Every structure is written in structure tokens, then in C-alpha cells.
């Protein structure tokens, strides 16, 4: 879990911004860790000669072994990408891949990093016209909220994944207790040069900086994107986060405040249990305006929720303050009542609406905050009706059996 403080640092560092295409809110919090090793980037309107409209860039970097690589990436990766020839040609997939590798090499060649053991994840989103390009290396995560459904734009890179494990072993490493060489809990990162061999190609390293890139064409169903480090995803599923954010939007809360509330609901009340909720936390929420202004975008989502168009966390989640919240008047920590419900589930990928009916058997219990929301009922109503009809028949038969047993018991008593 790493070293922790006796009391968490719950001060938030929040920013926001907008243009005609996106609105974003971003917040970070040190939490229980002895230092803050996360970093982020939010650049509106990057210039690209290949497209008419400006390009928007968002990224979250989760550092480990120190903060130097993460902070360097937060300051330099956007510029490396913008200067990349492939970026200026409009080849955004290859531009993202080569920019991650170029950043890795630039750090390696920098004298100030020669004795630095740190590394960082990177999850990046580019908005280019009506497309999203998501590049990811590590176990930070980017998720799209599409009418309340979590759609993964990235996949966590864990050493236990068979493809990742095969690369690690082929490069001379091993996986022990779910960690690279028994040490690192993720299998791709920028930095971490103790795991890199100058005789191997960048994509074949034990720990590679090469990202996976997902391209998504934005549809009218798509509402917002959430980028966050694993300090969030270890505590909430992708589906829970999307529903939490959606409820905050319905309540008219600013995106940076929703991010703050989410972190407060993830942070642990103490460090005595599993270690979940004790990490640094960073959350970036990006609204996809799609020709709406801010107020129209908020109203569109509120109208959808009012019409029961997709799952949303219950109304009380817009006001819930978790263990990390402090009063704005005196910075006094609020004592959380014993019956406060703080979800502590291991993160899981979201599921898109094209999934088959067996993709998630009971999302309302394991991955959803929406009261009464059932995956099958929402997307496979005919199947749900058949199951409900069968269940009702079972209940009727069960009630009949109970009644018969009662009659027999009365007769026996007489």
C-alpha cells in the first residue's frame, strides 16, 4: 500500500475550462499518502494543421516511486505530441504512440533522471472533431458515459493479463504475486528504467511505455468522459463512477465539484483495513457539448434522467459527503455516521450497450448505484419480462404451497 500519514491531506486542487466543444472540471487530492505523485494536463485548442477545428487534450498521470516522471509528463507530453509530425499530418493514433515512446526516451536521456527510480501511468484523451482518441499505458483509466452506461475507452495494463505476462517473460522478467518481478503492480509505464533494457525494442520491454489507442466516434448518446487514476478505480467500478457523475450533473453541480465529491466518497476513513481509498486521487471530467452550450448540456442530461433514459445514482448521492469532506467554514473534518454507505468494490470495466445479455448478470448489485436498475431489464426487456413472468409463477406456486401447508397444520391441530 505504501507509507501513509496519520491524517489524510484532503485539500483539493481544482481547475476548470471550456471552449465551444468541451467543458471540463479537474481535481486532485493527496489523501493518506506521504506525498502527492499524481499529475495531469488539460490543454484546450491545440493547433493541428491537418484539421480545421482545434484539438483538445486531457491526461492523468499516476506516479510511483516518486513524482518526477509524472510531473515531467504533465508539463511536457502535450508539447511533445503537438510537435509530432504525425500529429500535424492528422495521424493521431501513431502520433500518440510515438509521443509516449518519445517522452520515455527524453526522460532516459535527461541527466536529472539518471538516478531517479520513478515512473508513471498515462491515460490521455484527444478530442478531434467528432472523434475521441484515447491512449493508455498503465492502470489509470478512461471511461465514456453514454446515457448513463460506462463504456471503457482504455484497458488496465496489469501483469496478470496473459498478453502482458507473455511480453514480460519474453523480455526476461517474471510475474510474482501479480507484480512485475514481484515489485511493480502495473505492466506499462513511462519511466521505470530499472525494468527497461537498451538492447530491446521499446514495445518489447518488461515494462513498456507503448500505449494502447482506442478511437471512438462520438454519438448523441455520449455525454461525458472521466479520466482518473487507480485511486478512484480501486474504490468504485466504472459504472458507479458514471452514475455518480451523472447525478451530480442532474443536480447542477460544477464538474470540478463533482470530481471533488467523488474523491471524498472514495477516500478511506482510516488506514486500518484493506488499503483501498488510501492512494493519491485525480479525476478529470470532460463534457461533450455537441453544439450545446453549458446550460443546454446540463438540461439535456437532466431531461434524460427524468425520462428514465439510462441509469443514474440516487438523488442523495448529489449531497453525500464521504470521509474526505471538510466544512468550508472552518476546515473541520466531518464525522461520518456509522451507517454511511461507502462503496468499496474492486474496479471493473464498464459494459457497452452492444454487449450480450450475459455480460453482466446483476449490474445493480455489483456495478451500479441506480436504485432498482437491472442490466437485462434496461437493454433486454423481452428477456427480463420472461424471467419476471417465470419468477411470478414461482412466487404464486410457493404461496400456494405455503397455504396448503397452513391448512394441513390447522387440521392437525384440530
Swiss-Prot record:
Mn(2+) 2 binds at residues 62, 230, 279. Its EC number is 3.1.3.16. Pfam families: PP2C. Keywords: Cytoplasm, Hydrolase, Magnesium, Manganese, Metal-binding, Nucleus, Protein phosphatase. It is an enzyme of class 3 (hydrolase). It is found in: Cytoplasm; Nucleus. Its main location: cytoplasm. Binds 2 magnesium or manganese ions per subunit. GO terms for cellular component: cytosol; nucleus. Residues 313-368, 380-414 are annotated as: Disordered. One of its GO terms (biological process) is signal transduction. It comes from the Eukaryota. Residues 23-288 form the PPM-type phosphatase domain. Mn(2+) 1 binds at residues 62-63. Dephosphorylating regulator for many key proteins. Has an important role in osmotic stability and cell shape control. It may negatively regulate the osmosensing signal transmitted through wis1 map kinase. This is Protein phosphatase 2C homolog 3. It comes from Schizosaccharomyces pombe (strain 972 / ATCC 24843) (Fission yeast).
Amino acid at each position: 500500500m505504501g507509507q501513509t500519514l496519520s491524517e489524510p491531506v484532503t485539500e483539493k486542487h481544482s481547475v476548470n475550462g471550456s471552449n465551444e466543444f468541451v467543458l471540463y472540471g479537474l481535481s486532485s487530492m493527496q489523501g493518506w499518502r506521504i506525498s502527492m505523485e499524481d499529475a495531469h494536463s488539460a490543454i484546450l485548442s491545440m493547433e493541428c494543421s491537418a484539421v480545421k477545428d482545434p484539438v483538445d487534450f486531457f491526461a492523468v498521470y499516476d506516479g510511483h516511486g516518486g513524482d518526477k516522471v509524472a510531473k515531467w509528463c504533465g508539463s511536457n507530453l502535450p508539447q511533445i505530441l503537438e510537435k509530432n509530425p504525425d500529429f500535424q499530418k492528422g495521424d493521431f493514433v501513431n502520433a500518440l504512440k510515438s509521443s509516449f515512446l518519445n517522452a520515455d526516451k527524453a526522460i532516459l536521456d535527461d541527466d536529472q533522471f539518471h538516478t531517479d527510480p520513478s515512473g508513471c501511468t498515462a491515460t490521455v484523451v484527444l478530442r478531434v472533431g467528432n472523434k475521441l482518441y484515447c491512449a493508455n499505458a498503465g492502470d489509470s483509466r478512461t471511461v465514456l458515459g453514454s446515457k448513463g452506461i460506462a463504456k471503457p475507452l482504455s484497458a488496465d495494463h496489469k501483469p496478470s493479463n496473459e498478453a502482458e505476462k507473455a511480453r514480460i517473460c519474453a523480455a526476461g522478467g517474471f510475474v510474482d504475486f501479480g507484480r512485475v518481478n514481484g515489485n511493480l503492480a502495473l505492466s506499462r509505464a513511462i519511466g521505470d528504467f530499472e525494468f527497461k533494457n537498451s538492447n530491446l525494442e521499446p514495445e518489447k520491454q518488461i515494462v513498456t511505455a507503448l500505449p494502447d489507442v482506442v478511437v471512438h466516434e462520438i454519438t448523441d448518446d455520449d455525454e461525458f468522459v472521466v479520466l482518473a487514476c487507480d485511486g478512484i478505480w480501486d474504490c468504485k467500478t466504472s459504472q458507479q463512477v458514471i452514475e455518480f457523475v451523472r447525478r451530480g450533473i442532474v443536480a447542477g453541480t460544477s464538474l470540478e465539484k463533482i470530481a471533488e465529491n467523488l474523491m471524498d466518497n472514495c477516500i478511506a476513513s482510516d488506514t486500518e483495513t484493506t488499503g483501498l481509498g488510501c492512494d493519491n486521487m485525480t479525476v478529470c471530467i470532460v463534457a461533450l457539448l455537441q453544439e450545446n452550450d453549458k446550460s443546454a448540456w446540463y438540461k439535456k442530461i437532466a431531461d434524460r434522467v427524468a425520462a428514465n433514459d439510462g441509469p443514474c445514482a440516487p438523488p442523495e448521492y448529489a449531497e453525500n459527503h464521504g470521509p474526505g469532506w471538510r466544512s468550508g467554514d472552518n476546515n473541520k473534518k466531518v464525522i461520518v455516521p456509522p451507517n454511511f454507505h461507502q462503496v468499496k468494490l474492486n474496479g471493473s470495466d464498464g459494459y457497452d450497450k452492444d454487449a450480450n445479455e450475459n455480460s453482466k448478470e446483476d449490474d445493480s448489485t455489483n456495478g451500479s448505484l441506480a436504485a432498482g436498475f437491472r442490466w437485462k431489464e434496461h437493454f433486454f426487456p423481452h428477456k427480463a419480462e420472461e424471467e419476471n413472468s417465470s419468477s411470478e409463477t414461482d412466487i404464486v406456486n410457493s404461496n400456494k404451497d405455503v397455504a396448503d401447508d397452513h391448512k394441513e397444520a390447522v387440521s392437525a391441530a384440530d
